[in-house]
Amino acid sequence: SFWPEEWYPDFEVTTCEDEISNPVFVPHTNNKNLWGVSICLNNQLKYVDENNQVQTSLARDSKDLYAHSMAQATRSYYENHTNKERGFILTRSNFAGTGKFVQHWLGDNYANWSQLRQSIVSSYEYSMFGFTQVGPDICGFFDQSDPELCMRWQQVGAFYTFSRNHNELSAPAQEPTQFEDQYVQVMKTAMRTRYE
């Protein structure tokens, strides 16, 4: 049993004064510390293991285990309530072994060439981590994608194991039909290649 009420941080722990919570190099955050944008990494997390025993772990050691537990519970529920057919369950957060239960979306990205390149690396990495289907938002989620970038991303996207074109509501539409014919034809060829 892996449900939210059984997994929670101990918010009364106030031991965030060590080198893990306050490293020498601090990335840019509004709060000027790592635990200000999340929970203290020294917090004790409590969870119920497969033998129904309450276990504890430090947040720094198993923070994403919560996401893994939710993926496992969702897969279990799905299989027990849908004639045991394997369904498509998409997650953004994960832990070692989560690919056994769900597929992975790489998260919100930007419409630029650097993010296109990074999506290839990330997709391969997550495949090595055991995810059978993984992919980014083709053409980028944030910012406006230009026709050349979107066309090239659609071509690369033909080879992602999880492929979708998706962007934020305030951004201009970036479906293949939104561009000039010269780009549409190339994108159409990419999609035909994917689904042949």
Located regions from the model:
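Catalytic-domain carbohydrate-binding cleft regions of carbohydrate-active enzymes
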Residues: 1-196
